[in-house]
Structures are given as structure tokens and as C-alpha cells.
């Protein structure tokens, strides 16, 4: 399974090489506070890509590295294989630590954009994130579910920025024994 994941990362990430820009019309948040963003986030909705296809219970965990970069651990449950998949990466700020514009690598020198374009500034409970173009979109939250108003805000804002919100996938977070046993594991 790790070989398959490595192959997928090898095939996908080169396509993102040099894709550390921001999609037209999308501005990263300013006044960003990385210490408040660290920790576990649940993927609520996304535009689908091969590297996440078929995954449920998807989470991302962000922590500071000794070198000042951010450690990223993405996890998801592969429904068809009945197994957990995990990828570890590194994120670096593009415009300084107070701007939600980062580049993320899960494979060597190849980086893709990670643009936080909307954020719950009061409590850091949700974030709207884009990649290098409008085919990459995520709604992340601190809890496995969010109020419908947040989802509606996400859809409205994303649609106004050119994302195809009709293709959103809403990620299942369940309470299967496997999910409970693995979801609580924070590294």
C-alpha cells in the first residue's frame, strides 16, 4: 500500500511543481496566526482528486517543525481497502507567517500552493483552502461536522471565485471502531 501511495504521490506532485502561485482573484487571509492554526482539522468538503479518491474520515494535522516549517500529516480511511492511508509533508510560508499563503510538499522539492482564503478569525474553527488553481478546494473544520451556515458560506464564496461547487464531495466522518481507534491518534 505504501508503494502505491508513493507511486501516486510521485505521479501527482510533479504536475504541481512550480504551482505555488495563487489562483486569479483569490486573496490569502492576512493577520494569520500559525500557532492558532496548528492541530487537527477535519476535511468537511473537497473537490475530488485521485490522491483522495475513496477516502473517508479525512483529517489534517499541522505542527511546527524544529526548522520553523510546518509538519503536515494527512490521513484518510480507504473504504475499498479497509485501511488507513497517511501522507506526511512539509509546508512553508510564501509571503511571511502572517499571510495564509503556503507551499506544501509531500515529495521532495515539488511544492503545491495551499491558500487559506477564508478563516474563522475569532476561534479558528473553519478554513476555506485552495490549491494552485480552482480545481483544488477544501473546507476544513476543527470538528467532523459544521453548521449548515458555514457550508453555505463556503459554497457561496467559492462559487463567486470560480470554483465548480456542484462537484463538491462531502466527506463522511463516522464512528466505526476503526475510525474511533485511528482518528484519535495525533502525532
Task: Give, region by region, the residue ranges found by the protein language model.
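Positively charged n-region of N-terminal signal peptides that target proteins for export
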Residues: 1-5
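A beta-rich soluble binding module of mature secreted/lumenal proteins
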Residues: 19-187
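Bacterial N-terminal signal peptides
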Residues: 7-15
Amino acid at each position: 500500500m505504501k508503494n502505491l501511495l508513493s507511486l501516486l504521490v510521485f505521479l501527482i506532485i510533479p504536475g504541481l511543481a512550480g504551482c505555488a502561485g495563487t489562483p486569479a482573484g483569490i486573496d490569502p487571509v492576512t493577520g494569520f496566526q500559525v500557532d492558532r492554526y496548528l492541530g487537527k482539522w477535519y476535511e468537511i468538503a473537497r473537490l475530488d482528486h485521485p490522491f483522495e479518491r475513496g477516502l473517508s474520515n479525512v483529517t489534517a494535522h499541522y505542527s511546527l517543525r524544529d526548522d520553523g516549517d510546518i509538519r503536515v500529516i494527512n490521513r484518510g480511511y480507504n473504504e475499498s481497502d479497509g485501511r488507513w492511508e497517511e501522507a506526511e509533508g512539509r509546508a512553508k510560508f510564501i509571503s511571511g507567517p502572517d499571510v495564509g499563503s503556503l507551499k506544501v510538499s509531500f515529495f521532495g522539492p515539488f511544492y503545491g500552493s495551499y491558500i487559506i482564503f477564508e478563516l474563522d478569525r475569532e476561534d479558528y474553527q473553519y478554513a476555506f483552502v485552495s490549491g494552485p488553481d480552482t480545481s483544488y478546494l477544501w473546507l476544513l473544520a476543527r470538528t467532523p461536522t459544521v453548521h449548515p451556515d458555514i457550508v453555505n458560506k463556503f459554497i457561496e464564496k467559492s462559487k463567486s471565485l470560480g470554483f465548480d461547487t456542484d462537484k463538491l464531495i462531502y466527506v463522511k466522518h463516522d464512528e466505526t471502531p476503526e475510525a474511533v481507534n485511528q482518528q484519535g491518534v495525533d502525532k
